[in-house]
From Swiss-Prot:
Names of required cofactors: FAD
Effect on the protein of changing Y228F: Reduces activity
Originating organism: Sus scrofa (Pig)
Protein name: D-amino-acid oxidase
Tissues/organs with expression: Expressed in the liver and in the kidney, including in epithelial cells. Not expressed in the lung.
Chief subcellular location: other
Designated gene of the protein: DAO
Protein localization: Peroxisome matrix; Cytoplasm, Cytosol; Presynaptic active zone; Secreted
Positions that bind D-dopa: Q53, R283, G313
Length: 347
């Protein structure tokens, strides 16, 4: 069975690992390849701050809530293990701030120690009148991609730097199953009017005294269009842009100033922080994740395609749950082709 995963961000690599982990012992041979025109450190995942936190609004597809929960549980199970540091994984606590009272998020029982802020805590943030505190997880994208790449390499998965122009090209190259994890560029392979870029620009600073994340919410401007501060293992991420439809990959000085001024107002000690990097990336924005099977016919043969893209600004938050779902769909393909000799492990 020849499987090609297109895309080498967190969605592509985690999906490749999940499939190989669950089927290598029951499907011989299982040949998995990863095709991508961008590998770490040049993917959208590399730009992500890495905080596990879904959007505050409930997803239109209830399955997404389950995939978020599965991902949190998977990551939490690695806390305290020798893998955690190499994965870029660590617990982090912090604040979500609002200018008015809002309902509790649907994920309040997924994270640890969720509670509303006290009046004394709100005194620290004079521009805000309401908020939450909880403990979550940081999963640093760049380090996690390196870890995933190492795990896949150990398993014999091969990586190819190439720009895929069509599914037909991959199918005619011998792929039995194609896993489409192309993120914001999925429309190149198959038109998808629901998919748009959500441009984000971030500033990385050296500010080791900052230990808590602070995410502000402006209900009129929308998600991630107000300041946020997220400490990581090596640096602190400052952000506050979410520009739907903007394909400009060049850092913008106006966005820089907006982010810097907003975050320094939120945390004045940042004025003394050294800027160590600035990056722009595109969140693959879609009303809901596209995770489904599709059969495409090229010449006289059918090729199975499993789509897994459109994760918006929460790819790291939902990635493992989606990988598990793709693995289930892959298992159904094998069953239909009578290729599964025994049940796969861990499904």
């Amino acid at each position: 069975m020849r499987v090609v995963v297109i895309g080498a961000g967190v969605i592509g690599l985690s999906t490749a690992l999940c499939i190989h982990e669950r089927y290598h012992s029951v499907l011989q041979p299982l040949d998995v390849k990863v095709y991508a025109d961008r590998f770490t450190p040049f993917t959208t995942t590399d730009v992500a701050a890495g905080l596990w936190q879904p959007y505050t609004s409930e997803p239109s597809n209830p399955q997404e809530a389950n995939w978020n929960q599965q991902t949190f549980n998977y990551l939490l199970s690695h806390i305290g293990s020798p893998n955690a540091a190499n994965m870029g994984l660590t617990p982090v606590s912090g604040y979500n701030l609002f200018r008015e009272a809002v309902p509790d998020p649907y994920w309040k029982d997924m994270v640890l120690g969720f509670r509303k802020l006290t009046p004394r805590e709100l005194d620290m943030f004079p521009d805000y009148r309401y908020g939450w505190f909880n403990t979550s997880l940081i999963l640093e994208g760049r380090k996690y991609l390196q870890w995933l790449t190492e795990r896949l390499t150990e398993r014999g998965v091969k990586f190819f730097l190439r720009k895929v122009e069509s599914f037909e090209e991959v199918a005619r190259g011998g792929a039995d199953v194609i896993i489409n994890c192309t993120g914001v560029w999925a429309g190149v392979l198959q038109p998808d009017p629901l998919l748009q870029p959500g441009r984000g620009q971030i500033i990385k600073v050296d500010a080791p005294w900052l230990k808590n994340f602070i995410i502000t919410h402006d209900l009129e401007r929308g998600i991630y269009n107000s300041p946020y501060i997220i400490p990581g293992l090596q640096a602190v991420t400052l952000g506050g842009t979410f520009q739907v439809g903007n394909w400009n990959e060049i850092n913008n000085i106006q966005d820089h100033n907006t982010i810097w001024e907003g975050c320094c107002r939120l945390e004045p000690t940042l004025k003394d922080a050294k800027i160590v990097g600035e990056y722009t990336g595109f969140r693959p924005v879609r009303p809901q994740v596209r995770l489904e099977r599709e059969q495409l016919r090229f010449g006289s043969s059918n090729t199975e395609v499993i789509h897994n893209y459109g994760h918006g600004g929460y790819g790291l938050t939902i990635h493992w749950g989606c990988a598990l779902e793709v693995a289930k769909l892959f298992g159904k393909v094998l069953e239909e082709r009578n290729l599964l000799t025994m049940p796969p492990s861990h499904l």
